[in-house]
Amino acid sequence: FMFFGCSSFNSDVTFTNTSNVLSMGAMFRTATVFNKPLNFDTSSVTDMSNMLRSTAFDQDISGFNISSLTTASAMFLYNTAFSTTNYDLLLVGWEGQTHNNSVNFHAGTAQYSSGAPATARAGLISDSWTITDGGQV
């Protein structure tokens, strides 16, 4: 809940050590103008639910280590800014990592492209992920 409700927050966020953080749930929820790169160590994070809900966030987070992730429900709910380009990168990047099965992931209205992104999305779904998004472009 670190920046939850900070509607005008759009500053660089650099944390020296997030390696022990378990939950980033609702971290930027309703920080409506937030759109800065995130370079967090997410290797221990299990919860990203509501993390970027209702934000203007459109950055590449395909490099987030999701090996411990168990829920990302409503992660991008009400976020209409997340671009196809960054969603494609996320799908391909996350599917290519070691990840848990049965993760609930909400990508808001983001849409994905055919080819590698569609294949990556199908791969996550075959690992029992529930993915809610805006569908294929």
Region annotations inferred by a language model:
Residues 1-137:
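Negatively charged
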